Regions:
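Short acidic/glycine-enriched loop/turn segments that link adjacent beta-strands
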Residues: 36-40
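Short secondary-structure boundary/capping segments within folded domains
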Residues: 33, 43-45
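Glyoxalase I/VOC metalloenzyme domain signal
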Residues: 1-4, 8-28, 45-67
Length: 67
C-alpha cells in the first residue's frame, strides 16, 4: 500500500506550512486557492508522499467542519 497524501485542516495555511517546513526540513511547497471549494491549500512535497494543508476561506467551506 502506498500513501499519496495526507490532508490536514488548519486555521492559517501560511503559518502551518512554515511550521511543517521547519519541523520536517521541507523545501518544496506550493500554494493555491480553490475558490469553488472555499479553500486555500499548501502542498508540501515529501520524498514519497505529500502533505496538504487546507484552510477554509469562508463559513460554507466543507473544511470548516474539521476545525
Amino acid at each position: 500500500m502506498k500513501i499519496n497524501h495526507v490532508a490536514i485542516a488548519v486555521e492559517n495555511v501560511e503559518d502551518a506550512a512554515k511550521t511543517y517546513q521547519d519541523a520536517l526540513d521541507i523545501k518544496n511547497v506550493e500554494f493555491e486557492t480553490v475558490e469553488s471549494e472555499g479553500v486555500k491549500v499548501a502542498i508540501l512535497h515529501l520524498e514519497n508522499a505529500n502533505i496538504e494543508l487546507l484552510e477554509p476561506t469562508n463559513d460554507s467551506s466543507p473544511i470548516r467542519k474539521f476545525l
